[in-house]
């Protein structure tokens, strides 16, 4: 009996799941949290442990031996390889509407919030398109958009500013409304 208990304990220790935390591109409005949860449920051997909409950070749990095909315990994959695999799975399952980014580079209290009012964004796809213009810019740590057409970006002021955001939106032909 003691031998069986010992084997079970050792097995439980060796079957631990790995976790990693990432920023999520695609969380531009609150209902996208539900979309992400549903998509992650479809990923084999990947669980969403925690999701913080305010920071757009998500913690994923997975068994790296199942996540990485051809896993070799003598040469475990790099953190970058695991992140790339998770990103590929998420991007494919969401048809490209969710992707991973590294965690924010500056603390929240050092970010500057910039609000930009834009023209009609009456559908989720339109809001996503306008959001993506900002979310992909260097220095944008987080962005949101609402049905009223208010885009909000939390930026690293050392890397970007309002003019750069407005310029990118204009280039993408998003109508800016003057306050």
Task: Briefly describe each language-model feature range.
Residues 1, 17-18:
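Absolute protein N-terminus
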Residues 18-179:
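Flexible metal-binding regulatory segments at protein termini and peripheral loops
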């Amino acid at each position: 009996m003691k031998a069986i208990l010992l084997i079970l304990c050792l097995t439980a220790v060796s079957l631990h799941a790995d976790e990693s935390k990432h920023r999520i591109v695609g969380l531009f409005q609150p209902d996208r949290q539900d979309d992400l949860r549903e998509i992650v449920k479809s990923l084999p051997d990947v669980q969403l442990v925690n999701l913080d909409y305010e920071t757009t950070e998500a913690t994923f749990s997975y068994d790296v031996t199942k996540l990485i095909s051809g896993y070799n315990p003598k040469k475990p994959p790099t953190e970058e390889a695991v992140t790339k695999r998770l990103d590929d799975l998420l991007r494919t399952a969401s048809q490209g509407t969710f992707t991973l980014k590294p965690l924010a580079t500056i603390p929240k209290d050092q970010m500057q919030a910039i609000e930009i009012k834009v023209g009609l964004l009456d559908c989720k796809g339109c809001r996503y398109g306008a959001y993506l213009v900002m979310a992909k810019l260097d220095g944008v740590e987080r962005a949101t958009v609402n049905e009223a057409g208010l885009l909000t970006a939390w930026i690293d002021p050392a890397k970007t500013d309002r003019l750069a955001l407005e310029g990118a939106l204009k280039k993408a032909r998003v109508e800016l409304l003057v306050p």
